[in-house]
């Protein structure tokens, strides 16, 4: 079993962040030939024996700032970040990363159903155009996103006229944090950014020695290739987002 665990860690550089739960789920998903999969406690013990220790988490700070005078939308999520179907309830946010030649702002839309990244955009500024581009990319990739709920904080980018017009154009139902900007009101997005930085950046890359373009390539590959398709997600019962999504649509075909 130790060899199977090491094989899992070697498949992707970010797999070394797996704790006992995700390692157990990865073993269950892959079912290595000739390997008996024991309980989580045994998995944890073996991980300790072979030096696969999970790194501690760090909490990133939010970067958007609320505009108290701007248009607001109701909180349609109310901290319920679950969804029974894809493309019905989503969250969006942005984060900041320091590079050698400036700052890179990363904006994404996550699906509450399986935590898939539906839209991703990056730029050296955090203006509303970045959020608009993220939404454009998401709808282009997933036209059925029209009519879904899209939740954000009350940052000036999300209360801007430009973003509001994009929301209307695509028939999206805009949702925002409740008055007062409580941190838990957009906890899903903040959690995703924390996981991204913990797995890809902290202790692995010195981003201040990398250019913006190098970071863009690294982040695109992480989210679109690894996060969506290969990363074990405990919230999905150990399934990568796109695997859970494929199973959902397959079940619809079987029921038809």
Label each PLM-derived region with a short phrase:
Residues 5, 23, 43, 47, ...:
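Mobile genetic element proteins and their domesticated derivatives, centered on retroelements
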Residues 53, 172-173:
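Residue-level detector of anion-binding/catalytic polar loops
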Residues 79-118, 124-128:
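An active-site-proximal beta-strand-loop segment
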